[in-house]
């Protein structure tokens, strides 16, 4: 999501996924924990007003924000305990597993979990 919002490498692939979701030919999901991660990064870098603007923009996109149930927390904790990933990334992995989803990312941290979840690598420039 940050690649898309900040015009980084991989933005076009994320844009295509969102266009496909708008047409109904695919689904884009995001764990609420990862939405929080995006918002804190935006607020830290650009301020609270910008974070609110980004939240409003994300809410207009064809993205289903997934709530976090207790079992998801337990699954994310297990992933974090056994893999060198951030806590927020553990939630992305757990949500992707639960929904049989593919993670779009350029974050090399996900190399260690490719046996757990399908990863589509965004091009890095």
Q: Which residue stretches match the model-derived regions?
A:
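Acidic, PIN/NYN-like endoribonuclease modules and their adjacent C-terminal/linker elements
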Residues: 93-125
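Alpha-helix capping/helix-boundary segments
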Residues: 1, 34, 72, 92, ...
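Active-site neighborhoods of divalent-metal-dependent phosphate/nucleic-acid chemistry enzymes
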Residues: 64-104
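Short, well-structured N-terminal submotif of metal-dependent ribonuclease cores
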Residues: 1-30, 43-56, 125
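Amphipathic alpha-helical segments within well-ordered protein domains
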Residues: 2, 36-39, 77
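Anion (oxyanion) recognition and catalysis
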Residues: 22, 59, 97
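Helix-loop "lid/cap" segments that line or gate small-molecule binding pockets
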Residues: 41-44, 62
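Conserved beta-strand segments of alpha/beta enzyme cores
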Residues: 27, 64, 117-120
């Amino acid at each position: 999501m940050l690649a898309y919002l900040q015009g980084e490498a991989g933005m076009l692939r994320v844009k295509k996924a969102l266009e496909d979701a708008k047409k109904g030919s695919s689904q884009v999901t995001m764990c609420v924990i990862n939405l929080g991660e995006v918002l804190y990064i935006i607020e830290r870098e650009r301020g609270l007003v910008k974070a609110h603007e980004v939240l409003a923009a994300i809410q207009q996109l064809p993205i289903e924000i997934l709530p976090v149930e207790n079992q998801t927390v337990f699954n994310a904790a297990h992933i974090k305990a056994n893999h060198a990933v951030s806590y927020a990334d553990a939630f992305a992995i757990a949500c992707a597993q639960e929904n049989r989803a593919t993670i779009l990312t350029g974050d090399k941290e996900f190399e260690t979990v490719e046996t757990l979840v399908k990863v589509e690598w965004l091009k890095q420039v």
